[in-house]
Amino acid sequence: MLRTHTCGALRKSDVGSPVTLCGWVDSKRDHGGAVFIDLRDRYGLTQVVIGPPEANEALIKQAGHVPNESVILIRGVVADRLEGKTNAKLETGEIEVRSEHFEILSASETPPFTPGQSDLPGEDLRLKYRFLDLRRKEMQQALIRRSEIIKCMRDYFAEHDFIDVETPILGRSTPEGARDYLVPSRVHPSNFYALPQSPQLYKQILMVAGFDRYVQVAKCFRDEDLRADRQPEFTQLDLEMSFVDSEDIIGLIDGLVAKTAKQVLGKDITLPLPRMTYEEAMRRFGSDAPDLRFGLEIVDVTSVAAKTDFRVFRGTADAGNFVRGINVKDSALKFSRRQIDELTAFVQQDFGAKGLAWFRVEDDGTLWSPIAKNFDEEHLAEIKALMGGEPGDLLMFLADTWEVTCKGLSGLRKRLAVELKLYEDGELNCSWVTEFPMFEKDEEAGRYVAMHHPFTAPLEEDLPLLKESPEKCRAQAYDLVINGSEAGGGTIRIHDSKVQSQVFELLGMDEETARDRFGFLLDALRFGAPPHGGIALGVDRWVMLFAGLENIREVIAFPKTQKAADMMTGAPGEVDADQLNELHLRTVSAKT
């Protein structure tokens, strides 16, 4: 080893010890006859003094000219800092190293930015020079946190007798969800592999094979439009179990959440985690991943709206749509008309709402609003009672379709929670949403699509609905929600080949297509398949949430941009003609 200690290891008890340190020059100061260098590595920072009597003039001069971010090696002796020169902000702040040997291992050019600067450049520049960005303490802490969480996960499932099995990266395209990333085959011209969107089918096959507890930290790929919390390639903790029901899976993951929170954050989580059905989540919060760190529950006032003279409310109710609202407690005087106009524009532009109606609850308990003249006192009193309105409250309403009121009020909840600081930084709220619909209707395609995936089993009591009313059929599905983000999703799987074929048919797949795409699964289900189920936990998102960050790219070492590009390597890039010829491919001009 070139070094005897890291830059964060030395303490007062090491005074007098000879040491060798290696690291990056974080900063340097020339104090006339002596050079002070703050030497940095991922463990911390140590002050190094290059000056007499330990160092000669040539060594001092060399140290004075070393560029910041250069990698150096120093040998010296640990000493107490001078009185009044200690730094309580550093764990090494009571000591310094008096250097008697100084060596530049790799000199640095002037970097476009430095790890310690407070005014960070734009994200594109940071991603282009990711090797510099990863030197920042915040980035290193995020990746260390990631490593801790993955280790915690692996340890937990090892304790529960899970077998870690690697599944293939090169598989077959089964275009049912997001677009696949395709890989051309050189030895099978005109044929393609697909990179896995998940190990779903392989892990089900493992259950049929008798591996009753499977787990894997799996790399997955989806060619979809990106957001701040999505990447084209991502990591998930994937597991499957035989002879279980949803209660077993949920209970197992409850334990993992508690273990991770305690071990990584030092927080206690009360178990079991709260649950609600999909129907309840949409009704109360307008989202299948509700943020429960704050209230602002949605209330349906359609029954009253239908009786009023306010044409917007009554017309909406008469058309079979909904009037729903939220009560922003003690906020009547916190929002000016201009601010309410901004919120109105927000729900219109982002969610397609027609407008935002509002009432202020006055000190005498009456409701005031520019539209209040369209309501008689009886109806205003009913609205206030339904909303739980009290003096000082601000009541906000959307009148629209179920979908628009859900999305609009859910988005409004989140925005208001941020503006009003309705939750604490670092707060962690975990819950389950269960009993999702099996299917949703794709109006453009004129057919059903699976809400989760085509291998999800229906609730036992809803099995007859597969034939009678598929849209009413509920799935044995469960999502883990952390702070309003989906942190994992799982289902109990279909283990009967006849039911699986029936679901394929409902999804518009004829027998030949189903056999072509999923024949191996249908065959496996005919040879003794146990009841089984599982879940996939998004590792990247878990780390983001447990680290209290907003951008998933902050917890991935080498992420892609929102255009799925790698700014550092230049991927994706063109390939030469010889490579294309080997793969029997040619390129065509992109459509504009």
From Swiss-Prot:
The record marks H31, G84 as: Important for tRNA non-discrimination. Its main location: cytoplasm. GO terms for cellular component: cytoplasm. ATP binds at R222, D223, E224, Q231, E486, G538, V539, D540, R541. It comes from Rhodopirellula baltica (strain DSM 10527 / NCIMB 13988 / SH1). The keyword Nucleotide-binding applies. One of its GO terms (molecular function) is aspartate-tRNA(Asn) ligase activity. This is Aspartate--tRNA(Asp/Asn) ligase. InterPro entries: Aa-tRNA-synt_II, aa-tRNA-synth_II, aa-tRNA-synth_II/BPL/LPL, Asp-tRNA-ligase_1, Asp-tRNA-ligase_1_N, Asp/Asn-tRNA-synth_IIb, AspRS_core, GAD-like_sf. Disulfide bonds: none annotated. Homodimer. Residues 200-203 are annotated as: Aspartate. One of its GO terms (biological process) is aspartyl-tRNA aminoacylation. Aspartyl-tRNA synthetase with relaxed tRNA specificity since it is able to aspartylate not only its cognate tRNA(Asp) but also tRNA(Asn). Reaction proceeds in two steps: L-aspartate is first activated by ATP to form Asp-AMP and then transferred to the acceptor end of tRNA(Asp/Asn).
